[in-house]
Amino acid sequence: MVSIPARCQYYDDHSFKYFIDFELLESHLASHDDVGAMCVSRPTNPTGNVLTDSEIHRLAALASQYGIPLFVDNAYGLPFPDIVFIDDAAPYWDESVVLSMSLSKIGLPSFRTGIIVATPEIAAALSNVNAIAALASGSGGQEIARNCIATGEIVQVAKNYVQPFYQKKSQQAVAWIHEFFAGGDFWVHRSEGAIFLWLYLRDLKITTLELYKKLKERGVVTVPGEYFFFGVEDPVAQCHGHYDKCLRLNYSGPEEEVREGLRLLAEIYKENR
């Protein structure tokens, strides 16, 4: 597995956003004939980034050009559960795309129901794999979702309840970060979707793995960013400036717990900058 490091745009409000480095991606595809697939998530776990429509269209065109599938993890995306906070993102599929979705984020996690949108050949192959991996898969999730999808009710629930619920929590968590980290060299990836915030602490003097251990001692659980840089055997990934300076934060918990966790995180960060 190889990661293609993203381009990064910084903004005046202590936010930033990742963009696909297509020059680097196309160079890699042109020089490596062993690439079997491309994989992205939209919205992205852990950053909350949403690939732009032009980015997803260009990726699909490259997949078609090189005869490989583009796997898109759409667990938080459109049209449901619609944990997407920007207006200029649209669902996308063509025959180069294998789109994976889930009922978990719409409120049915225990059914463990995934949805694949793909060509009939790929869908059949994945169905065969699933039959081997799970001999007797449950059908409760499919049965519950079938009518909701057919009537469009699931899209309305996502738009009217799920999306605003998480967007409010995201905005509140970002406001607390600005309050507690004031004066620090902190940057928050623009929260465009999903249930996570991606915090970049540029002047942190320890790695986020070390910071994680200090936070855990205080009862605060985060996920250090090193785990999300897949393909770290590639020197380019190891040299990424964000590799050991970022944390994934889950903002979906009770407000008082999230607020106190962010306060403690800021306190420990300031002790190690």
For the regions a language model picked out, list residue spans one by one.
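PLP-dependent class I/II
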Residues: 1-273
